Regions:
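A short, N-terminal "cap"/entry segment at the start of jelly-roll beta-barrel domains
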Residues: 1-48
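Conserved short histidine dyad/triad with adjacent acidic residue
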Residues: 32-33, 46-62
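A cytosolic small-molecule/anion-sensing beta-strand core signal
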Residues: 43, 71-72, 87-88, 106, ...
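Structural motif
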Residues: 46, 55, 74-76, 83, ...
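Short, conserved beta-strand element in jelly-roll/cupin
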Residues: 51-52, 61-78, 113
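Short glycine-/acidic-enriched loop or helix-start segments at secondary-structure transitions
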Residues: 79-80, 88, 104, 122
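Short acidic-glycine-tyrosine-enriched beta hairpin
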Residues: 80-96
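Ligand-binding loop in jelly-roll beta-barrel domains
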Residues: 96-123
Length: 123
C-alpha cells in the first residue's frame, strides 16, 4: 500500500441475508486512504465494497480468484505483463496466483467478489 495512504479492511460480514445493503451510508463514514468492508456472504464467496485512492501493494492470492467491479471512478490493475484500466460499470477477474497491484488516481468505489477464505492483503 502507498505509505501515504490510510487503509482498513473489515472482513466481518456487515449485512445478513434478506437485509437491505446500503453502501452509500457506509461510504459516508470513510474519509481517506483505502477502506474495504465485507458486505455479505453468498455461498462460498464474499462481496466487499472498497473505496479510496492511492496504490495498494503488489500481492497475490494463492487459492482464490478475485473479481473487481468499478462502481465509480477509475481503477488501474497492474499485472506483471500488462496494465488494465477500468471505468464505471467495468469488471475484471484476476486468477488465483497472479501477482497484481491495484491503484486509483482519484477516489474510486469498487465491488470485489472473492472466496470467503481470502486474505484481502494477499498471501
Amino acid at each position: 500500500m502507498d505509505t501515504n495512504s490510510v487503509h482498513s479492511h473489515n472482513t466481518e460480514v456487515a449485512f445478513d441475508p434478506l437485509e437491505v445493503i446500503d453502501t452509500h451510508r457506509l461510504q459516508e463514514k470513510w474519509q481517506e486512504g483505502w477502506v474495504s468492508q465485507t458486505l455479505c456472504q453468498v455461498n462460498d464467496c464474499v462481496v466487499r465494497l472498497g473505496a479510496g485512492h492511492g496504490k495498494f501493494h503488489w500481492h497475490k492470492h494463492d487459492n482464490e480468484d478475485e473479481f473487481f467491479y468499478v462502481v465509480e471512478g477509475r481503477l488501474i490493475i497492474n499485472l506483471n505483463e500488462r496494465t488494465v484500466e477500468l471505468g464505471p460499470q467495468q469488471g475484471f477477474t484476476v486468477p488465483r496466483g497472479v501477482i497484481h497491484c491495484t491503484e486509483a488516481l482519484e477516489r474510486t468505489v469498487i465491488l470485489m467478489v472473492e472466496g470467503s477464505t481470502v486474505t484481502p492483503t494477499g498471501d
